[in-house]
Amino acid sequence: MGSGGKVEYRKLEAFQKKLQKNLTGTEMNSFIESCAKELAARLLAKVIKRTPVGQYPTSSGKKGGTLRRGWTGGKSGGSAYAQSLKVNHYGDVYVIEIVNPVEYASYVEYGHRTRNHEGWVEGKFMMTISEGEVRRNAPKILENKLKKKLGECFKL
């Protein structure tokens, strides 16, 4: 037969209190929101990189990059912009809406007919492809964040 071991109940109770404090109520809600914002920041980083920039001759006076700048509303960093986005909470679902307000964004994303209606310009699918990549990587990203959060609870 095995022998009994020693258990320090004070440390166990302290761990229980710390776990309850860190994983309930508003603390849990803010953790989930930070996870959503991190995923949004990663999505923005990928979609901004994939968004094409128009090339114009210098003499035209046009400047390319309007569509790319549209992802952040003209603000400089995608990560900083993602942190400023509002997280909507519907039941047990957290939603961040990422929109490019540039009027021709959907045409570049999905493709469109040519001006003379005799051809088709293929879409770039910058959002669709980026969303798929983030969706595939999300479990690992969230697992790492959860491990880090639980690690904070184990530090007594």
Show where each model-derived region lies.
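Short, Lys/Arg-rich flexible segments
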Residues: 1-156
